[in-house]
Amino acid sequence: MASQQIRIRLKSYEHGILDESAAKIVATAERTGAQISGPVPLPTERTLFTVLRSPHKNKDSREQFEIRTHKRLIDILNPTPKTVDSLMKLDLPSGVDIEIKL
């Protein structure tokens, strides 16, 4: 019989709330008796934007902005129905994007 697995991928611009959310998910899953693999830090995605400082001239004067997207991966092996229920009821911060695959 094949074992079931839940893969949770977390994304956020702030690594602090991302690690806090990952810790909550791991604690909830361990409390309900599931096996955990992770959180695994995935590579940080860096997006760079370059804009002109002046609206009309001075092409040499530019400003750069960046957005860093931090990612974590958590695998829950052999989840129980109690694990799934407690993960659905879990309250996480609003700055974290959660992607769940069964």
Curated annotation (Swiss-Prot):
Family from the record: Belongs to the universal ribosomal protein uS10 family.
Subunit structure comment from the entry: Part of the 30S ribosomal subunit.
Pfam families: Ribosomal_S10
Top-rank taxon: Bacteria
Gene Ontology CC: ribonucleoprotein complex; ribosome
Record-level GO BP terms: translation
Known role: Involved in the binding of tRNA to the ribosomes.
Protein's name according to its UniProt entry: Small ribosomal subunit protein uS10
Record InterPro entries: Ribosomal_uS10, Ribosomal_uS10_CS, Ribosomal_uS10_dom, Ribosomal_uS10_dom_sf
UniProt-listed SMART domains: Ribosomal_S10 (SM01403)
Keywords: Ribonucleoprotein, Ribosomal protein
PROSITE patterns: RIBOSOMAL_S10
GO terms of molecular function: structural constituent of ribosome; tRNA binding
